[in-house]
């Protein structure tokens, strides 16, 4: 199908998003075309603003518009615990259950030899630097319960064991092969309660 160039460009842009194929991209493009101009401009501004103003916290790696992020700044949080997650979306999922009150460390990925991602490609060095703080007593490994997440948890467990810090892994109330961001609060809560030392 031949579309006018601006629509083709918009369809191509939507297709760059994960899970958006040509049909969905075309549907979205035509929806945008039918929207009021001020709504489209507001949408475009939101896209630009998120790219310009959202960055990663220099301490934990979570998404933020301030530095440090609101979690790292919060003096009421338990500074003896760090929960290690793969992505910022996992921090949001953990925070929704309102039961964990410690700090976080976002790895921004997981070890995946098949994809050429090794320990040096994710934020492990930054985690080790944070663990030099002697107030840390427990590291909770909350990587996804899939092959990459398990490999990352095992690697971190072996790497951190000599530090003497208690290393725990969230329990598997989560489906194997699933992602933390899709788990409901009850499942996440049970998984956190049932974490075990590695």
From Swiss-Prot:
Pfam families: RecR_C, RecR_HhH, RecR_ZnF, Toprim_4. The keyword RNA-binding does not apply. NCBIfam families: recR (TIGR00615). Residues 80-175 form the Toprim domain. GO terms for biological process: DNA recombination; DNA repair. A zinc finger (C4-type) spans 57-72. It comes from Geobacillus thermodenitrificans (strain NG80-2). It comes from the Bacteria. HAMAP family: RecR (MF_00017). Gene3D superfamilies: 3.30.60.80, 3.40.1360.10, 6.10.250.240, RecR Domain 1. This is Recombination protein RecR. One of its GO terms (molecular function) is zinc ion binding.
